[in-house]
Regions:
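C-terminal cap/substrate-recognition subdomain and adjoining C-terminal extension
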Residues: 1-3, 73, 77-189
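Active-site neighborhood of HAD-like aspartate-dependent phosphohydrolases
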Residues: 1-49
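Generic structural signal for well-ordered secondary structure
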Residues: 14-18, 54, 140
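Alpha-helix termini
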Residues: 20-23, 27, 63, 115, ...
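A structural signal for alpha-helix termini and helix-coil/disorder junctions
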Residues: 27, 46, 50-51, 67, ...
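Short, compositionally biased "basic patch" segments
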Residues: 36-63, 113-121
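Metal-dependent phosphoesterase signature
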Residues: 53-87
């Protein structure tokens, strides 16, 4: 089956959905600020001290999910933020299937992907009640592993990403075009 493959954050969504979702939830539920020390420990532990994995850092960042109904909040978030999807991304008007593969959690981006008509969503499997990741963070080579497992019958015509370095492995799956997104603008690599 022929498809175009898209990263999500800063590719089809003009922004970083994880941090924007957190800010959205913080405005609605100010008490989640109590998770900030744990979130900071995760960020510093990974990015500064290199003592914890990216996966664990992400779990600590999303620890605030324990205090909210994350799936309900995700629905509300996309009611407000759907206009930040890039105008050129319109799966229902494509001549081939649309696959989104993202490091963002499934629960967080599924509402907008469903609304827009994405045919297949492959993303980080995170428990929306705990913030714990089931399996691996869907990033870099893990994206290729997941695509081969969950989209084995797909052939990817064009691949779109904002980051040709971290998404280098999925760019290699393109049979026609590799497209770099910067500031919402597309350019062929």
């Amino acid at each position: 089956m022929l498809a175009d493959l898209y990263d999500f954050d800063k590719t089809v969504f003009d922004g970083e959905s994880g941090s924007e979702f957190w800010l959205f939830c913080l405005k609605r539920h100010p008490s989640i600020i109590r998770f900030l020390p744990k979130q900071a420990a995760g960020l510093f532990g990974h990015y500064v001290f290199r003592k914890i994995s990216k996966k664990r850092s992400k779990e600590l960042f999303y620890s605030y999910l324990k205090a909210i109904d994350a799936e309900k909040e995700a629905e509300l978030f996309w009611e407000e933020k759907a206009d930040k999807m890039n105008d050129w991304f319109n799966p229902r008007e494509h001549d081939v299937k649309t696959v989104v593969c993202s490091a963002s959690p499934v629960f967080q981006i599924k509402p907008v992907c469903d609304k827009l008509g994405v045919d297949l969503l492959i993303a980080t499997r995170m428990n929306p009640s705990t913030g714990l990741i089931e399996g691996e963070n869907c990033k870099s080579t893990e994206k290729v592993f997941r695509l081969k497992k969950e989209a084995a019958d797909y052939e990817f015509r064009d691949v779109y990403t904002d980051n040709p370095v971290s998404d280098g492995p999925i760019l290699e799956l393109a049979t026609r075009k590799k497209i770099h997104i910067q500031g919402g603008k597309r350019s062929e690599i």
